[in-house]
Amino acid sequence: MENQKQYPMTQEGFEKLEHELEELKTVKRPEVVEKIKIARSFGDLSENSEYDAAKDEQGFIEQDIQRVENMLRNALIIEDTGNNNEVQLGKTVTIVELPGEEEEEYQIVGSAESDAFKGKISNESPMAKSLIGKKLDDEVRVPLPNGGEINVKIVNIK
C-alpha cells in the first residue's frame, strides 16, 4: 500500500475542514443536483448549456468532497507541547524585521489550513521553514521569492 501524504493541522483546522465537508455534502451537492434536474427539464441535453454548467459544477463539488475527505482521513493533529521556548508547528510567533521595530505575528500551521490574510502561514513556506526550531531572541535569515533575504528577530512564541 502506498504511503498517503499526511496533513499536519491544528484541531481548529480539522474542525473547519469537517464543517466544509458537511457544507459540501448537505448544501452544495443537493443544490447542484437540483440545478441538473431543472436543466434536464429544458429538453435536448446536447445543446443545453445550463445542463453542461451544472454537470461541470457537480464534478468540481465531488472533487472538493474527495479532497477534503482525504485531508481529514490523513490529518495529523498538532498537539500543543506547552514549550513556548521554540518555534514549532502550531505555535504563534512574533517577529521583528531588522533593523526595525514593527512586529508581525504568524501562526505556523499545515498547508491545509494556511491563510496569509489571517496570519496563518504554511509550515512549508520559506518563512516557516526558517523559523521552525529557532528560539526566543534568535535572529533568523528568511529567503525572499526574489532571491534576496531579510533578517528577523523572534520576540515572542506562544
From Swiss-Prot:
One GO process term, biological-process aspect: regulation of DNA-templated transcription elongation
Classification via InterPro entries: GreA/GreB_C_sf, TF_GreA/GreB_CS, Tscrpt_elong_fac_GreA, Tscrpt_elong_fac_GreA/B, Tscrpt_elong_fac_GreA/B_C, Tscrpt_elong_fac_GreA/B_fam, Tscrpt_elong_fac_GreA/B_N, Tscrpt_elong_fac_GreA/B_N_sf
GO molecular function terms listed in the Swiss-Prot or TrEMBL record: DNA binding; RNA polymerase binding
Domain of life: Bacteria
Sections of the chain in a coiled coil: 4-75
Tagged with keyword Transcription: yes
Pfam families reported in the protein's UniProt record: GreA_GreB, GreA_GreB_N
Assigned keywords, A-Z: Coiled coil, DNA-binding, Transcription, Transcription regulation
Assigned protein family: Belongs to the GreA/GreB family.
Function as written in the Swiss-Prot or TrEMBL entry: Necessary for efficient RNA polymerase transcription elongation past template-encoded arresting sites. The arresting sites in DNA have the property of trapping a certain fraction of elongating RNA polymerases that pass through, resulting in locked ternary complexes. Cleavage of the nascent transcript by cleavage factors such as GreA or GreB allows the resumption of elongation from the new 3'terminus. GreA releases sequences of 2 to 3 nucleotides.
Family annotation (PANTHER family): TRANSCRIPTION ELONGATION FACTOR GREA
Protein known as: Transcription elongation factor GreA
Organism name: Staphylococcus saprophyticus subsp. saprophyticus (strain ATCC 15305 / DSM 20229 / NCIMB 8711 / NCTC 7292 / S-41)
Lineage: Bacteria, Bacillati, Bacillota, Bacilli, Bacillales
Originating gene: greA
